Amino acid sequence: MTNLRKTHPLMKIINHSFIDLPAPSNISAWWNFGSLLGICLVIQILTGLFLAMHYTSDTLTAFSSVAHICRDVNYGWLIRNLHANGASMFFMCLFLHVGRGIYYGSYLYKETWNIGVILLLTVMATAFVGYVLPWGQMSFWGATVITNLLSAIPYIGTTLAEWIWGGFSVDKATLTRFFAFHFILPFIIMALVIVHLLFLHETGSNNPSGINPDSDKIPFHPYYTVKDALGFMFLLLTLLALALFSPDSLGDPDNFSPANPLNTPPHIKPEWYFLFAYAILRSIPNKLGGVLALLASILILLIIPFLHTANQRSMMFRPISQTLFWILAANLITLTWIGGQPVEHPFIIIGQLASMLYFLLILILMPLAGMFENYMLKPKL
């Protein structure tokens, strides 16, 4: 078996990726989220496949088909709840995974990081088109508001929006194409994940200290396979608890009403995992400005490697940068809260301040902190 594992063309790839892979001996539980994201993706693809067998992408029957899945299909309610809450678990793991990358300086593996940012954008696009499919009130109005932002692009905006819609508003053509996108994108994500891992295995994993770990490595199996298995158990337990005990707690009550173009919900908002970006979008009282800020809030991740000024890679021994990092984390939670609030005083000003602080921290304060820490570490004569 050992020889087969090391000689068979397919087994050899698996062996070098998951069995005999040399891994740093000191990586903590923060390194579990990559494998957890893999499990989330598999769960989403499997549950999504079974949902697609019963779903109809037509404006007249989409809402009813989702109700039919929950009422009449064997374990349809469970599959639907796992799929809807699986998305929340996916994004929770994603945000923690990105946060880990920022804290420990993993972004200095530029290729891996850039593919990761593309993955994040692709997953966000997939979740957005997926949220439209049940064709409830929030599905319809969320799609209308977000796709309408394209019309803010000068000259080609209106044409582009109508091209995406397949008409003059969000309608049957939009729903059909969004279903097609939602079906194909997870497979594109799978391909990108393979590229992400390919680049990661070129350099090997980073570790909490940020120091080159080549002198002290251990095989991935059994050490990290067992450690990952523990993470899987926690993830599946949390997902099952959420799907079985409070499946609708993260959704919007408006989505229990069928889509009605003549009746606008009192407060249009996306799912919780988009609220931070939605708050940044709303904090600028100009359509094009808001769209640019929304894009910048995610694309700013691409320039983080170029803003690294510290002599040390990880924040483990950099208390000032650590403090700023946790302020950034708290700020993102604040933005998430603001995104779910109505547009009125004092939420408007809080959102504007939090949005400003978000860009200020990443673009100015954190690079300055790195330079200051370098200065503090210089031997004084």
Curated annotation (Swiss-Prot):
- Give the miscellaneous note: Heme 1 (or BL or b562) is low-potential and absorbs at about 562 nm, and heme 2 (or BH or b566) is high-potential and absorbs at about 566 nm.
Q: What does the subunit comment say?
A: The cytochrome bc1 complex contains 11 subunits: 3 respiratory subunits (MT-CYB, CYC1 and UQCRFS1), 2 core proteins (UQCRC1 and UQCRC2) and 6 low-molecular weight proteins (UQCRH/QCR6, UQCRB/QCR7, UQCRQ/QCR8, UQCR10/QCR9, UQCR11/QCR10 and a cleavage product of UQCRFS1). This cytochrome bc1 complex then forms a dimer.
- InterPro entries according to UniProt: Cyt_b/b6_C, Cyt_b/b6_C_sf, Cyt_b/b6_N, Cytb/b6-like_sf, Cytochrome_b, Cytochrome_b_C_euk/bac, Cytochrome_b_N_euk/bac, Di-haem_cyt_TM
This entry's comment on the bound cofactor is: Binds 2 heme b groups non-covalently.
Indicate what this protein is called per its UniProt record: Cytochrome b
Protein's job: Component of the ubiquinol-cytochrome c reductase complex (complex III or cytochrome b-c1 complex) that is part of the mitochondrial respiratory chain. The b-c1 complex mediates electron transfer from ubiquinol to cytochrome c. Contributes to the generation of a proton gradient across the mitochondrial membrane that is then used for ATP synthesis.
Query: Which Pfam families is this protein grouped with?
Result: Cytochrom_B_C, Cytochrome_B
- Which residues are noted in the entry as heme b b562-binding? H83, H182
Cofactor dependence is on: heme b
A GO cellular component annotation here is: mitochondrial inner membrane
Report keywords, A-Z: Electron transport, Heme, Iron, Membrane, Metal-binding, Mitochondrion, Mitochondrion inner membrane, Respiratory chain, Transmembrane, Transmembrane helix, Transport, Ubiquinone
Q: Which domain of life is it from?
A: Eukaryota
Q: How does it sit in the membrane?
A: Multi-pass membrane protein
| Gene Ontology annotations of biological process type | mitochondrial electron transport, ubiquinol to cytochrome c
Q: Where in the cell is it found?
A: Mitochondrion inner membrane
- The gene behind this protein is MT-CYB
Q: Which residues make up the binding site for heme b b566?
A: H97, H196
Q: Which CDD domains match?
A: cytochrome_b_C (cd00290), Cytochrome_b_N (cd00284)
Disulfide bond entries: none
| Positions bound to a ubiquinone | H201
Transmembrane spans? 33-53, 77-98, 113-133, 178-198, 226-246, 288-308, 320-340, 347-367
Molecular function as annotated in GO: metal ion binding; ubiquinol-cytochrome-c reductase activity
Q: Which PROSITE patterns match?
A: CYTB_CTER, CYTB_NTER
Q: Which SUPFAM superfamilies match?
A: a domain/subunit of cytochrome bc1 complex (Ubiquinol-cytochrome c reductase), Transmembrane di-heme cytochromes
Its family remark reads: Belongs to the cytochrome b family.
